[in-house]
Amino acid sequence: MLNLEYPNFEKKSLDELELKLSEPIKKINIRGKKKEFFTKAGKILSIILPIEPNTGSSNQQFNALWLSPDEWLVYFNEENNNIYNKLFNEISRLNFGSIVDVSNQWICINIKGKKTFDLLSSGSPFNFNNFKNTINSVTQTLLNHTDVIIHHTEINEINLFVRRSFSEDLWLWIKDSARFI
């Protein structure tokens, strides 16, 4: 397996806002439509995959984010490394669905504080009015012209997923913009 190097983002605390890199975490893209897919995924992850658009579901270990009618992003701490193998062996190998490790494609940035949604609104066309009141909501949008996935985990706290190649540019924009809100 490749030895992944994560961007060197220093934790930043500003007035009512905290920014930090939330890595390493495992990120798996799962796809499927068959009944067996949902049964196996639910049993292995001990979670029901969300079927409503722009929602997520969570338990003590795993977070599952709805991306499309047959696609989810599941993320969790690296300690559960054998989960990928279980999912792959019981779903992909049996042609019930697709399991792809995308950990090295996405970087997770955690943003929390009272000004979280002010910061996001300053660089996104998405209207966060309803989003910020619904925990476990998910959106795929643009932030400073960069594709992101945003998971609302707690009140005034989000996990923002950005492609690795855009992560440093977006991090610099976030730090700079946070000073002016």
Where are these regions (language model features)?
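Basic, glycine/lysine-rich polyanion-binding surfaces/domains
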Residues: 1-181
